Regions:
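Arginine/glycine-rich "motif VI" loop of SF2 helicases in the C-terminal RecA-like domain
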Residues: 39, 123-124, 151
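Structural motif
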Residues: 88-91, 157
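C-terminal helix-cap and adjacent tail motif
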Residues: 3-12, 151-182
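N-terminal amphipathic, basic helical "cap/leader" segment at the start of enzyme domains
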Residues: 1-87, 182
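Short, charged/polar surface micro-motifs in flexible loops or helix N-caps
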Residues: 52-57, 63-64, 97-99, 140, ...
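Small-aliphatic-rich amphipathic alpha-helix that forms the alpha element of a beta-alpha
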Residues: 33, 91, 97-145
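Short, surface-exposed loop/helix-turn segments at secondary-structure junctions
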Residues: 62-72, 102-106, 144-147
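Short beta-strand segments
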Residues: 93-94, 160
Length: 182
């Protein structure tokens, strides 16, 4: 699939089939992510492929966080379990932190480009993803589970990867709403 078609086919998916994505597709997507532009050649992105054991620990933490906000019934808990366990892969994406706040901002933009490249590469192989940045990505226990030093790296998202259920139809703004010649 050419790049433009992959860009147009890329979608954020919220529900995944319980079907495995090949490691070759994942590795190709990481290679694509690593081609992202970055100012000053900092290459600030890091990707962690989360094992099932670690994913179960993160799932337990997600339920714990949810229970602090409100009671959840068995059905809601099953939906959370499906969300965490059905995707083929969970990648945790982090950014190497720089002491200079301007460089940190540039590096976040570079990490965003890397995630977009990853998503487009996956889409070119008929695989979908979701970049999530919820409370669990900022929780100190997540850093402990994944063994990330929060003084050196910041988790900027979970990337859920897999084959999608119920592909969404997106209505995008018209080009004249987002683009002007001046």
């Amino acid at each position: 699939m050419d790049a433009k078609k992959a860009i147009f086919n890329r979608r954020t998916i919220h529900f995944f089939e319980n079907k495995k994505v090949s490691e070759n597709i994942i590795k190709d997507a990481i290679e694509a992510a690593n081609q992202a532009p970055c100012h000053r050649s900092t290459f600030p992105w890091r990707f962690y492929s989360v094992s099932l054991k670690k994913r179960m620990q993160i799932l337990d933490l997600a339920i714990e966080i949810k229970l602090k906000k409100k009671q959840i019934n068995e059905n809601a808990e099953n939906i959370i379990k499906e969300k965490y366990l059905n995707p083929s892969h969970l990648l945790i994406t982090s950014q190497i932190l720089d002491s200079n706040l301007n460089i940190q901002k540039e590096d976040y933009a570079a990490c965003s480009c890397a995630i977009q490249n990853l998503s487009i590469s996956l889409a070119s192989d008929g695989v979908f993803s979701k970049w999530s940045t919820g409370a669990i990505t900022k929780n100190p226990k997540t850093y402990e589970i994944i063994d990330i030093n929060s003084k050196k790296e910041e988790i900027i998202g979970f990337i859920w990867i897999g084959y999608g259920k119920n592909l969404p139809k997106i209505t995008r703004p018209l080009i004249d709403q987002i683009y002007k010649e001046i």
